[in-house]
């Protein structure tokens, strides 16, 4: 009994602590939530250790995320040049963010991009062809919003250049030393994306957009993603993952609508572990995103999800729960 309690204690410590030691990738959480909490929707900045420029992984909250992150000291090492007319938030948006990687075009993943577009600088939007098509058809169309893209309806303001990524093909990321490969994910009958970024040393970081488990989605998309990541696990090159857990385990499969629970996440990660053997994911840093904000007068879903992940974490992974404004190194 005492040994079991100690095991739970050590697992809890691994969940609630994450050292800010030097790593291959630097991230800043501009938005951590899924669903209805406007101003704190899914968005992460990332850069390799060798780069000074960031790219953004989804863009649910952009300017508000930059404001909160600056207030929390996430950009304390960045100095605005004397020649710049901008605040630090403006300088970051216009000069240091060099592109957007959009996993899918649901509003909670693109709202910040759309709202900030009038004052943004020229940059690429990377995505699978279907995602970019949704952006130009549904948002940048002179009906919902002016067309800031280089394709689509009506006059094109040419601020954003749509870059259609070919699934499974590595492509360079402009104005960085990184490259990227993208793969489609299944999201309740729609398509989402996992982006795998690789730095100049061959280290990789995986960002998963919204996704359901293969078993529920009747898909093999997650298994395909794990098979691409498996060789990097074997080489010790997978430095971290950001992946969603939108709901607690109490949510029935029929109500997941293309999302994960703690149980389903660990089952999916077990597929990756099986590809390299027991213990191969020990100490892997896995950041949890997209926890849905709840209006119910009950325990915070984030607290419940933390507890439930602890209970089933027989993989030895280090679960991290970033808050808006947090800067983490992987």
UniProtKB/Swiss-Prot annotation:
It comes from Aliivibrio fischeri (Vibrio fischeri). Keywords: cAMP, Hydrolase, Periplasm, Signal. CDD domains: class_II_PDE_MBL-fold. Its main location: periplasm. This is 3',5'-cyclic-nucleotide phosphodiesterase. GO terms for molecular function: 3',5'-cyclic-AMP phosphodiesterase activity; 3',5'-cyclic-GMP phosphodiesterase activity. Pfam families: PDEase_II. It is found in: Periplasm. It catalyses: a nucleoside 3',5'-cyclic phosphate + H2O = a nucleoside 5'-phosphate + H(+). SUPFAM superfamilies: Metallo-hydrolase/oxidoreductase. GO terms for cellular component: periplasmic space. Residues 1-22 form the signal peptide. Transmembrane segments: none annotated. Its EC number is 3.1.4.17. It comes from the Bacteria. Seems to allow the organism to grow on cAMP. The keyword Hydrolase applies. One of its GO terms (biological process) is cAMP catabolic process. Gene3D superfamilies: Ribonuclease Z/Hydroxyacylglutathione hydrolase-like. PROSITE patterns: PDEASE_II. Belongs to the cyclic nucleotide phosphodiesterase class-II family. It is an enzyme of class 3 (hydrolase). The keyword Signal applies.
